[in-house]
Amino acid sequence: MYTFVTSLNKEYWESTSKVNLQSWCEHLPSEVKIVLYSEDYIDVGSVHPRIIYKNLYDAAPELVAFKERHKDNPHYNGKVGHKQEGTTKAFKWRGIKFAHKTFAIFSESKIQDTGWLTWLDADVLMHTEMTAEFLEKLFPKHKSISYLGRPGEYDECGLM
């Protein structure tokens, strides 16, 4: 069994991700569970009944506490001085933004006890059928973690 998890806010849902998640429903095998965590209410049923919506703040009160604790800390908000601000490395100091991703994964991991738990960024648009055989190649049974490696300094964490 596969569970694909993502998180986003309502603005991102309306701008692009609604179409993207619809493509997941069309191209992933029917037995794949699709879970969307958001801090905003999103009517996913209007897109596809297969998408499961979960309120991120209800599922992860620790995220709310984390954001409150670090709301004024520039190292958690992407403002670490002129040297990094506005550069490609600024993401390293956007802990609050990326915490939504990690807390969504952690929340879902607490309730899933079988199969693969897979993070997929909400900006992914699927254009080709992903068969069960293809997923088995991406996520081999003899491995516990899979991700998209790439040359250079940073790995791709949009699919893990």
Region annotations inferred by a language model:
Residues L21-E31:
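Short, acidic, metal-binding catalytic loop of nucleotide-sugar glycosyltransferases
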Residues E31-K33, W116:
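Residues at the starts of beta-strands that form the adenosine-phosphate
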Residues I34-E39:
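Short internal beta-strands
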Residues I42-I111:
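Active-site-proximal specificity loops/subdomain of glycosyltransferases
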